[in-house]
Amino acid sequence: MALIAGPTASGKSALAVALAKALGNGTVVNADASQVYADLAILSARPTDDEMQGVPHRLFGHVDGSQAHNAARWADEAQGVIAQAHAAGRVPILVGGTGLYLRTLLYGIAPVPEIDPHIREAVRALPVAQAHAALAEADPAAAARLGPADTTRVARALEVVRSTGRTLASWQQAREGGIADRVALAPLVLLPPRDWLRDRCDVRLVEMFDGGAIDEVEALLARGLDPDLPVMRAIGVPQIAAFLDGTASRDEALAAAQAATRQYAKRQFTWFRHQPPASWPRHIESLSIDIIDNLAIKLRETVLTR
């Protein structure tokens, strides 16, 4: 199984298709949290039919926006798709930038029990400093690792230890359901120059705005979905919604979406630089057509020798 990971706009999709064609029997499997949604074809940069070039693509646009997809559900789906590809004599090529999805598929998920809703509500109501102080008392190691400003992770660690009596780290050591030890993996992480990546993000947002993203969000808003659903919080949706309701100009909405995309790409870049195993190859150059073809050839050889 091949795996191509990296931040948004780094060229993963084009490389995945090139690899699939070089192999002759590749199937591209989506590992991006936004690209699962049917409602976000444009804003998620889901590959078009032309970009797919006849290569089979799986787990793209198969989830309705009214549903809240998650890593555990995606990993279950991905395991099924991977098994189907292998049974058909094809090579699955995982491609995406959602690190949590990839980590859950490969290494499993921590079997943390459901959190007591009263504990969750109490934890989420704590002021930032107080929450971090409480975590320092209940789980010193987590508090030392997480800064007070990392409010989401602080709250998660605190609610887990309060609700279960065990630290989140101890639960994570008991991960179950991963496939890393059952597949021969050929990974590649794309970490192109930051300036090149930022420019790509900005240009792509312009193309999205000019290519139907506004109509896409207008249709999404017309559904009257819960604003807390992931599809409603996807990058570009709130910004375009502000333009549509008159609280922002088109240029302001575009600039805000570009800024949000750059920030997201920066977080992804940092995650993929540090979190995957050191043995995973990193490609640190920008991607051109020639480089994509060369990478596909090299990755093909890696796949075939695993």
Swiss-Prot record:
Keywords carried by this UniProt record: ATP-binding, Magnesium, Nucleotide-binding, Transferase, tRNA processing
Reactions it catalyzes: adenosine(37) in tRNA + dimethylallyl diphosphate = N(6)-dimethylallyladenosine(37) in tRNA + diphosphate
Top-level EC class as recorded in UniProt: transferase
InterPro entries linked to this entry: Dimethylallyltransferase, IPT, P-loop_NTPase
Cofactor: Mg(2+)
One Gene Ontology term from the biological process aspect of the record: tRNA modification
Residues at which substrate binds: T8, A9, S10, G11, K12, S13
Record-level Gene Ontology MF annotations: ATP binding; tRNA dimethylallyltransferase activity
Disulphide bond pairs: none
Sequence positions that bind ATP: G6, P7, T8, A9, S10, G11, K12, S13
EC number: 2.5.1.75
Marked site positions, Interaction with substrate tRNA: T98, R120
Described purpose of this protein according to its UniProt entry: Catalyzes the transfer of a dimethylallyl group onto the adenine at position 37 in tRNAs that read codons beginning with uridine, leading to the formation of N6-(dimethylallyl)adenosine (i(6)A).
Family: Belongs to the IPP transferase family.
HAMAP family noted in UniProt: IPP_trans
Subunit-structure text: Monomer.
Protein name: tRNA dimethylallyltransferase
Gene: miaA
